[in-house]
A protein has these predicted regions:
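Conserved beta-strand-loop surface patch within small alpha/beta domains used
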Residues: 1-87, 95-166
Length: 166
């Protein structure tokens, strides 16, 4: 299961990580699924958009349903591609490294949909930079959680200029 992070999103992630180096933040995120022809299980996703709605503290952040509801209409208007995406979450672990804690895994399990998939991305400014996972319920109501390997998270990086080397 892969995740692609486009350059524009990568730059936005870095901005928030630099602005809040010791504080966790979170918000809804929209993911475009990618399928092999004729298959219903995605081979990967692209992180299309995210909107931080909560600035937590050093060890936690919380998203309330009302926070997400308030931004949905504007998000769909400003980013029409999000209407065809699956919604999930993104949050930071600032300088602790990106990984799925027990709380993060419970969030994935609690939000596993009966149809489609719930995606979650964790980002960090130190150590492991990205972690990605999905959850879903199968036809028998059993919840599944799939974590991507770090090498399956692809960032579209900016071209390094001579100015950046100085």
């Amino acid at each position: 299961m892969y995740l692609t992070i486009p350059l524009e999103i990568y730059l936005k992630l870095n901005y928030f990580l630099k602005q809040f180096p010791t504080t966790e933040w979170s918000g809804p995120a929209w993911y475009k699924p990618h399928y092999r022809k004729g298959e219903k299980f995605p081979k990967g996703f692209t992180l299309v958009h995210f909107h931080p709605v909560d600035l937590g503290h050093g060890t936690a952040t919380t998203i309330e349903a009302g926070d997400t509801a308030r931004i949905l209409q504007k998000t769909w208007k400003d980013y029409p591609e999000t209407e065809k995406c699956m919604m999930g979450i993104i949050h930071s672990h600032h300088n602790m490294g990106a990984f799925f804690s027990g709380t993060d895994k419970n969030c994935l399990k609690d939000n596993a949909p009966i149809q489609n998939f719930y995606c979650s991305t964790v980002v960090a400014s130190k150590k492991e930079k990205f972690a990605f996972a999905i959850s879903y319920q199968d036809q028998y109501g059993k919840t599944h959680l799939i974590e991507s390997k770090s090498e399956d998270i692809n960032m579209q990086m900016p071209n390094k200029s001579k100015e950046q080397d100085k």
